[in-house]
């Protein structure tokens, strides 16, 4: 696009040291934010219906718990607008330090929150408030972290260097699932419900301090600094960054929403909804999907950078479409495996969805989305599109899936169709969208 400012092949790339510091800083913050955000989803599936909604029955309590999970996504676009605006004006690094602080404090407070039996309806009210703060913080995280790594990355290696943001997702999933699984194995059911689930939330403080130390060494990208020099000239004053992005590239927001469906549905159905469905509807042990979450998180630390390297070599679009089609073909077999209660096939199709399909589409998102917008409003544009997609396609995925099962008499077919259709739409969107030179 003619309005997009990017490093051209003939220009000198950012130093390798600068690129690596940006990649590590983006990775560290992403670990904290995704650890906190995913920990909530895991705990909502296991605990929150009984701790915060015991008065409305198991089925409705599950729906209420998953609804609070979705609340975080509702506030992500607002966080993206606020952090994106100031990130485009004041710099990415300042905003990224703030998102980590905010997420860590909110998560630790959830770990200290009294239950419904202790303070009544104030418990779920405060839970929703803290979840909203989490959503607001993570809303500001992705765009800034992705931009800092993409803008600092050497030309031709942007997918690989920016993949740390998504690897942070995998490490966050690994840590959150692993710690919940460890505490679950060391405590009785009553102890886990009483205090055990709180330990992983309080552990977030340690991760926050580590991430802040790493991020403090990051520098702004040369591309952003160059753009700021242009924008400081009187003749270059512009509208608010988010308004600029909306006016210049309205179609880009719809593209991002459609492209993220595969990623969001595959991950949240496998890691959040299936955990609840398999334990409450099928009687499978909760350790099964907690261990699957561990495996998914661990493998993604390898698969995401590998797929990103392949995308830089063979084209982003090819990798993305392949992943989305794998997700399309794995939806119904995954639920058939659940019904059969075969551990081998459950594991196989869970990995096909949450590792292969999911990781192939997320590994190219940072450069694919950010290059839809100009550098002066990229934080706002790519970030708002990303977070609106989170609301539309991801935030209420466990809630929608649970509602489909509840109102269809316990049948899984509608959820499998929901998953399959979303992945197929993502594949078709990638196939038909305007081709980028590196795709």
Regions found by a protein language model. Give the residues of each.
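Extracytoplasmic gate region of multi-pass secondary transporters
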Residues: 41, 250-299, 394-398
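Extracellular/periplasmic helix-loop-helix junction of adjacent transmembrane segments
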Residues: 44-76
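Cytoplasmic membrane-interface "Motif A"-like loop-to-helix N-cap segments
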Residues: 89-100, 313-324
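C-terminal ends and interior cores of transmembrane alpha-helices
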Residues: 101-119, 326-341
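Glycine-rich segments within core transmembrane alpha-helices of 12-TM secondary carriers
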Residues: 160-184, 385-397
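A membrane-interface helix-boundary motif in multi-pass transporters
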Residues: 185-202, 403-421
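Multi-pass alpha-helical transporter architecture, strongest
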Residues: 211-218, 368, 420-439
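C-terminal transmembrane helical hairpin of 12-TM major facilitator-type secondary transporters
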Residues: 318-364
